[in-house]
């Protein structure tokens, strides 16, 4: 999609996502999900064994990120053959890109019909082990806005960082 179309559709509120797309005339939205079976397995693992539930949840998160990495790798192969350049992934909830855009991202990708991926009234995805993201597309090399703690508006009061972790590792 063209960056202008995403902006007009209300998908790009906030400054951080615009910084991420600096130099990009287009962007790609992506969504991946491990499906409802993984959510069910995590629940079953946690019955009577909290540690197994926590471990299963962490494994599911890691697998969802690996699925997103695989999707991104396919997009990078396409970009190389099309002589295009991509930024890294930037997901709703990064920086000031409000998680409230999640329903708009899901609607733009028609995730409910195509992948069974829905968004709750509180902007959480179901199945839980799912990832949505945006990558900028350009005709020249671009870096995009770096994601992570150094650029997060919550970095000074983040509960994850207080425990020596990051939200990406949860």
Tell me what each language-model feature is:
Residues 1-5:
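Conserved small/polar residues in nucleotide/adenosyl-binding loops
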Residues 6-22:
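Active-site cofactor/substrate anionic-group-binding motifs, chiefly glycine-
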Residues 10-13, 35, 93, 127:
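Glycine-centered flexibility motif
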Residues 17, 38-42, 59, 75, ...:
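Generic structural signal of hydrophobic/aromatic residues within well-ordered alpha-helices
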Residues 22-91:
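Conserved mixed alpha/beta catalytic, RNA-binding, or beta-rich assembly cores of soluble enzyme
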Residues 82-160:
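Short terminal or interdomain "cap/linker" segment that borders an active site or interface and mediates
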Residues 165-170:
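Short cysteine/histidine-rich metal-coordination sites, predominantly Zn2+-binding motifs
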């Amino acid at each position: 999609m063209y960056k202008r179309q995403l902006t007009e559709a209300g998908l790009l509120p906030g400054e951080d996502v615009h910084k991420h797309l600096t130099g990009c005339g287009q962007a790609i939205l992506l969504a991946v999900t491990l499906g409802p079976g993984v959510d069910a397995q995590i629940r079953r693992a946690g019955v009577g064994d909290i540690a197994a539930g926590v471990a299963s949840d962490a494994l599911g998160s890691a697998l969802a990120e690996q699925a997103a990495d695989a999707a991104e790798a396919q997009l990078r192969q396409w970009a190389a053959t099309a002589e295009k350049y991509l930024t890294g992934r930037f997901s709703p909830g990064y920086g000031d890109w409000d998680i409230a855009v999640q329903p708009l991202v899901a609607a733009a990708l028609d995730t409910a019909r195509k992948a069974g991926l829905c968004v709750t009234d509180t902007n959480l995805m179901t199945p839980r082990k799912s990832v949505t993201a945006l990558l900028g597309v350009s005709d020249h090399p671009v870096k995009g806005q770096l994601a992570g703690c150094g650029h997060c508006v919550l970095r000074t009061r983040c509960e994850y960082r207080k425990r020596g972790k990051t939200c990406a590792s949860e």
